[in-house]
């Protein structure tokens, strides 16, 4: 495959890999199931809301790129979709699992990859995750890149290159916005907790005053 994937196409391929490995009894996926898999709110970053037309158009492109093909079962005329990404890039199971998570959840640290691939492949430790990343970064056309650690980050992150080179400046800006949103959320949570404590304190004080009055 020489052509890069779009963000929609990468989400579709990631969703197909995930469902193949976690719910093989429902794989290949129908169009409806695939749309739902792309749009699910858990294990997705960002959360999207693709319609059938968007997914159908992307599937047509993926078929032209020889990454996805249509499957018709012997008992159903409803078309179902399969991916063949490991065949295209000669990927081993751990490499497929890592790419799946990167396509579904964006840039990840070593620890996040080990945790979030647990249903797809059981890594023995961070060393095996790192070795797997090295494998897909050392090939002639690397599939993964290690991103520079940004201010406020404790660890470097890794991102897939199936959709092309990473815009580092855009990534840094997005990460900064995300960090600010997280900080704002933490402040809001602390303010809410403080207000709850004040309310509880006032309640206990009133209860104590009422208790004292019994002996006056």
Question: Where in this protein do the model-derived segments appear?
Answer:
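Amphipathic alpha-helical oligomerization/assembly segments
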Residues: 177-200, 204-215
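Positively charged, polyanion-binding regions of nucleic-acid-associated proteins
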Residues: 6-25, 89-107, 133, 138-139
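Helical coiled-coil/dimerization "stalks"
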Residues: 116, 148-162, 202-216
């Amino acid at each position: 495959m020489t052509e890069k994937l779009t963000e929609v196409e990468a989400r579709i391929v990631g969703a197909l890999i995930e469902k193949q490995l976690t719910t093989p009894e429902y794989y290949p996926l129908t169009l409806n199931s695939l749309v739902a898999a792309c749009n699910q709110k858990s294990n997705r970053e960002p959360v999207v809301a693709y319609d059938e037309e968007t997914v159908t158009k992307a599937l047509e492109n993926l078929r032209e790129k020889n990454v996805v093909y249509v499957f018709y079962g012997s008992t159903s005329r409803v078309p179902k979709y399969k991916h063949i990404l490991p065949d295209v890039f000669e990927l081993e199971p751990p490499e497929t699992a890592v790419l799946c998570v990167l396509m579904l959840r964006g840039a990840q640290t070593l620890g996040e990859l080990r945790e979030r691939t647990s249903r797809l492949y059981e890594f023995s430790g961070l060393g095996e995750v790192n070795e797997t990343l090295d494998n897909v970064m050392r090939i002639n056309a690397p599939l993964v890149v290690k991103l520079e650690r940004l201010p406020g980050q404790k660890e470097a992150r890794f991102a897939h290159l199936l959709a092309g080179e990473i815009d580092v400046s855009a990534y840094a800006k997005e990460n900064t916005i995300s960090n600010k949103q997280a900080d704002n959320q933490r402040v809001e949570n602390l303010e809410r907790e403080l207000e709850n404590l004040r309310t509880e304190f006032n309640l206990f004080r009133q209860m104590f005053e009422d208790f004292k009055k019994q002996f006056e």
